[in-house]
C-alpha cells in the first residue's frame, strides 16, 4: 500500500516542479557606515511598504543600468542614501514576494555593499517606510531571510578584519 502512495507523492512533486516559475531577479544594497566617534559598523534597514518587515533596499532590474547601479539607485529612492557601491556582489538570498494581486513570486536577490557618505533630506519614498541605522547584530536579528543574515554576518567579519589590518599598520 505504501508503494502507490510513494508514486503519487513523486508525481505530485514532479507536477509542482513543472509549473514552478524560475525566480525573478532583484538587486539590493547592503548600506553601511562606520561611526566616526566609536568606529562602530552600522547597517541601514528599512521597513517594507506592504508587510512592515525589516529589509534592505532592493528592486527590479532597470534598462540601461548595471546590477550594482540598480542597487545604488534603490538605496537612494527607498532610503535617501548615496555612497560608493561595490561592483562585485556580496552574495544572494531568496525570498517570496507577494504581489498586489496576492500571487507569490520567488525572487533571487543579489546584494551589493554600499558605503554611505550622503543622506538626502528629500527622496522618492520618504515617509513611506521606517528607516533605521542599527548594529550588525541587531540587523541579523531583524531580517527574516537566513541567507541575508549570513551575508550580513560575513560582511561584518570582512569589515572587522579590514579594521584590524588598518590598526596593525
Give the positions of each predicted feature.
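Unchanged
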Residues: 62-150
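Thr-Gly-centered strand-to-loop micro-motif
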Residues: 56-58
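Short, charged/polar surface micro-motifs in flexible loops or helix N-caps
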Residues: 34-38, 49-53, 62, 95, ...
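Short, solvent-exposed loop/turn segments that connect beta-strands within catalytic domains
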Residues: 35-42, 101-104
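Short, acidic/hydrophobic/Gly-rich beta-strand patch recurrent on exposed beta strands
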Residues: 44-47
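Acidic, metal-coordinating catalytic segment for phosphate/diphosphate chemistry
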Residues: 1-36
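Charged phosphate-binding loop/patch that engages nucleotide di/tri-phosphates or the phosphate backbone
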Residues: 10, 143-169
Amino acid at each position: 500500500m505504501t508503494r502507490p502512495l510513494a508514486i503519487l507523492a513523486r508525481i505530485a512533486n514532479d507536477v509542482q516542479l513543472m509549473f514552478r516559475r524560475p525566480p525573478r531577479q532583484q538587486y539590493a544594497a547592503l548600506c553601511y557606515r562606520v561611526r566616526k566617534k566609536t568606529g562602530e559598523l552600522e547597517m541601514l534597514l528599512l521597513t517594507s511598504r506592504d508587510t512592515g518587515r525589516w529589509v534592505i533596499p532592493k528592486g527590479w532590474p532597470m534598462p540601461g543600468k548595471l546590477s550594482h547601479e540598480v542597487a545604488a539607485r534603490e538605496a537612494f529612492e527607498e532610503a535617501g542614501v548615496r555612497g560608493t557601491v561595490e561592483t562585485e556582489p556580496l552574495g544572494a538570498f531568496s525570498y517570496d514576494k507577494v504581489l498586489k494581486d496576492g500571487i507569490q513570486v520567488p525572487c533571487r536577490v543579489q546584494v551589493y555593499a554600499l558605503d554611505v557618505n550622503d543622506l538626502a533630506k528629500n527622496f522618492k519614498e520618504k515617509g513611506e517606510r521606517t528607516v533605521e541605522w542599527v548594529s550588525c547584530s541587531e540587523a541579523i536579528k531583524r531580517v527574516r531571510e537566513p541567507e541575508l543574515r549570513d551575508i550580513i554576518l560575513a560582511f561584518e567579519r570582512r569589515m572587522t578584519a579590514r579594521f584590524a589590518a588598518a590598526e596593525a599598520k
